[in-house]
A protein has these predicted regions:
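Extracytoplasmic cell-surface/polysaccharide-interacting catalytic and binding patches
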Residues: 3, 32-113, 127-208, 214-230
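N-terminal twin-arginine translocation
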Residues: 10, 29-31
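Bacterial N-terminal signal peptides
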Residues: 16-28
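Segments that shape or occlude catalytic/ligand-binding pockets
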Residues: 118
């Protein structure tokens, strides 16, 4: 997605107060599955060489719901192979851990919709929606998701997704992180809780998508990776 950064976050906002607002704002969407119990298997040699880690090693209670591993995405078909994992660059580890820790006292859990995204998948996404306002045009370098340095996340409470006002990859102005028109007060509050928690982990909001957060160096051009997502 474009490299714009989010507006300054109000760090004085009390997370637990916001969570009280959120408590009545759980969506009626079908429950999402929790991450499997047990140890997390090692990442592939290629992923390890790229500095990638499985997000469950640093956020063990993470809920993994990779949309591009299913047909529940705007392309309508799975784009990731079976066994796809949420891989992120190790530079995001401490930040994601801090964000998750900030949410736990309020009974909230991070849900990961996308993490590292292979270049060929980015190409297919842009072919489906060739509009750089909505989908980043793939280039000669990797950055953001293609470099494993951005994540698409939402929140869950008790296994139910919170109501954020849109679904993932909503190509609409109300997907803007700070949208007010067409976004209820509760939905705005839910987005603020997510944004504030991610800010505690030094993860920057991309304004155009409330679910997208960039880690350190996300906008830096890097060589395109040949790392399988499974």
């Amino acid at each position: 997605m474009p490299d714009n950064r989010g507006m300054p976050v109000n760090h004085r906002m009390n997370l637990l107060f916001s969570a009280a607002v959120v408590a009545g704002a759980v969506s009626s969407a079908a429950p999402v599955s929790a991450a499997p119990d047990g140890g997390v298997p090692p990442v592939s040699a290629a992923a390890s060489a790229a500095g990638f880690i499985d997000v469950r090693t640093i956020v063990p209670d993470a809920i993994i719901d990779l949309r591009y591993a299913t047909a529940n995405n705007f392309v309508g078909v799975p784009l990731y192979p079976p066994g796809a994992r949420c891989l992120v660059h190790e530079s995001l580890g401490a930040g994601l851990s801090a964000a998750a820790a900030a949410l736990r006292p309020a009974g909230l859990t991070l849900v990961f919709w996308d993490c590292y995204r292979p270049h060929d998948v980015q190409v297919r996404l842009f072919e489906a929606v060739p509009n750089p306002n909505w989908v980043a045009e793939p280039g000669d370098y990797a950055r953001s998701h293609e470099a494993g340095r951005s994540v698409d996340v939402t929140l869950a409470s008790g296994g139910q997704l919170l109501d954020m006002g849109t679904d993932f990859d909503a190509f609409s102005p109300i997907a803007n992180a700070y949208a007010t028109d067409g976004v209820t007060t509760r939905q705005q509050a839910n987005r603020s809780v997510l944004r504030n928690a991610m800010a505690k982990g030094w993860l920057a909001q991309y304004v155009g998508e409330w679910w997208h957060f960039d880690g350190p160096g996300a906008s830096v051009d890097r060589p395109i990776l040949d790392v399988p997502v499974n």
